[in-house]
């Protein structure tokens, strides 16, 4: 079984109103350089860390690397090169790895992108979120719709032929027509991959407070469902395949790295708040950037959480996110559990509600089930 590597770069030019990730507003180059040094040290100390290595963690060859954030495209090419060199020295890498970097529009130049490409980055993922400038402003995004279009031109000019957009539906005050315009604008740019999410509200964010005080009204559940139906209809017409609840790709361009999470494959994660999975247990690093750096510099482990997983349960609710669903025979052979027998009453209820279906020894969500997936997942959590 192959593994992925995730590296968290927490710095952003500013914090978006809906963001619940571990991020820090970019202050100065010295802070970033110190963080990069800590990140490299954590990678170098990987095998000697307190998180006890299983055979999977020690032996799996790596076929994906993913820089997430935050805004990884704030890294200078020299910093990226140092991080990658530490990975190449430490891990066994397979050929033709997928190397993704998240980017924000208007944070990159043609020269920077060409440098990233020369260092092996072969997939770019960036958060367009919306093509409506007023919506971008309400979300606290620093870029404009024209910045997104310009960034795509820069990426293509630098030789990137695997580009992914993030878009968010169900934004405050957004109508179905607004969302359709956003989707049409994205499809005009012909990205190889689209991640299309319904807005999630996280407590403690400015947006959550604005919604609570009725300053930012949200679309109702029925409208959100219509927005999702529009996604599946329009992307299909343009040749995209829906391979996961929120992810659509042209043939051959599904995200290999993100698929590891849904298939319960190992991911070694480094950096502040990074979450790892070794095939048996999940690990999480310190969420505060300053504390993370201090721990690493003091030769301590940044790990603050470790938990053995109920893999039999996770395999179901994560696997159901995929359009192909779960192979029932493969599942029974792996875990010794007959899903139809163990969850008979719940499955009957969900099937009667039109949320799941059985087809050729597979259990999968229906189109309606993808809209109301949380109702299905709670059965297996």
Predicted regions: what is each one?
Residues 1-3, 23-49, 55, 61-337, ...:
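C-terminal scaffold of the Radical SAM
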Residues 10-21:
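Local cysteine-cluster metal-coordination motifs and their immediate loop/turn environment
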Residues 368-381:
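Short, amphipathic alpha-helical interaction segments positioned at domain boundaries
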Residues 337-349:
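Short amphipathic alpha-helical interaction segments
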Residues 351-361:
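A short, conserved structural fragment
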Residues 362-366:
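Minor-groove-contacting beta-hairpin "wing" of winged helix-turn-helix DNA-binding domains
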